[in-house]
């Protein structure tokens, strides 16, 4: 009895293992190594798990004929690295060509730190610096054709005046009236004689 039950249990166990082994080998897996080094796994059976943990065939393993990973961490080919036919990097850190560095045909840097040519330094054809610190020519220094300085501290032009000493003044006051004084009395129609007659009549 015991022998037969042990035998039955053993046979059942062997049958279960055999069924499991048969179920394991009920599918076919093909590994294909392509010329570019990519490995393709193909599973052909209805008993495989299509989506999930053991799905070994995915679209991410299809051969990439460009030789580069198109999207992702190792994408080494981008639009920013297309050849630039101008010979310079157009946009970015090393852009050494800018509009501010176009050749200036005047020979001077037009705008910026080293602009040494300004409108205030245009040639002055009068021979003097017109406006600024060293302007030595002013309207007050225009030539005066009278020969004297017309306005200012050193006006040496005096009116026609004669200076007399004390003796000369007394002599001039006691002198007889000159022709100029006589002419001034004539202007009023009065002579010396008529003046004396008029004075005598007033005393009577």
UniProtKB/Swiss-Prot annotation:
A lipid is attached at residue 174 (GPI-anchor amidated asparagine). One of its GO terms (biological process) is cellular response to water deprivation. The GPI-anchor is attached to the protein in the endoplasmic reticulum and serves to target the protein to the cell surface. There, the glucosamine-inositol phospholipid moiety is cleaved off and the GPI-modified mannoprotein is covalently attached via its lipidless GPI glycan remnant to the 1,6-beta-glucan of the outer cell wall layer. Residues 1-20 form the signal peptide. Residues 47-59, 67-79, 87-99, 107-119, 127-139, 147-156 have a biased composition (Basic residues). Belongs to the PGA14 family. Hydrophilin which is essential to overcome the simple stress of the desiccation-rehydration process. This is Hydrophilin YNL190W. It comes from Saccharomyces cerevisiae (strain ATCC 204508 / S288c).
């Amino acid at each position: 009895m015991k022998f037969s039950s042990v035998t039955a249990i053993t046979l059942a166990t062997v049958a279960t293992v055999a069924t499991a082994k048969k179920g394991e080998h009920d599918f076919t897996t093909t590994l294909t190594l392509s010329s570019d080094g990519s490995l393709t796994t193909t599973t052909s059976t209805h008993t495989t798990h299509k989506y999930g943990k053991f799905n070994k065939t995915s679209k991410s393993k299809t051969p990439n004929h460009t030789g580069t990973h198109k999207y992702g961490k190792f994408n080494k080919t981008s639009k920013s690295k297309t050849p630039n036919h101008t010979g310079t990097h157009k946009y970015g850190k090393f852009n050494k060509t800018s509009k501010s560095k176009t050749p200036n045909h005047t020979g001077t840097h037009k705008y910026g730190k080293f602009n040494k040519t300004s409108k205030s330094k245009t040639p002055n054809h009068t021979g003097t610096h017109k406006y600024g610190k060293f302007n030595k020519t002013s309207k007050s220094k225009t030539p005066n054709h009278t020969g004297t300085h017309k306005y200012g501290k050193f006006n040496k032009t005096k009116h026609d005046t004669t200076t007399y000493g004390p003796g000369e003044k007394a002599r001039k006051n006691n002198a007889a009236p000159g022709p100029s004084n006589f002419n001034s009395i004539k202007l009023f129609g009065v002579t010396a004689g008529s003046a004396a007659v008029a004075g005598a009549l007033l005393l009577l």
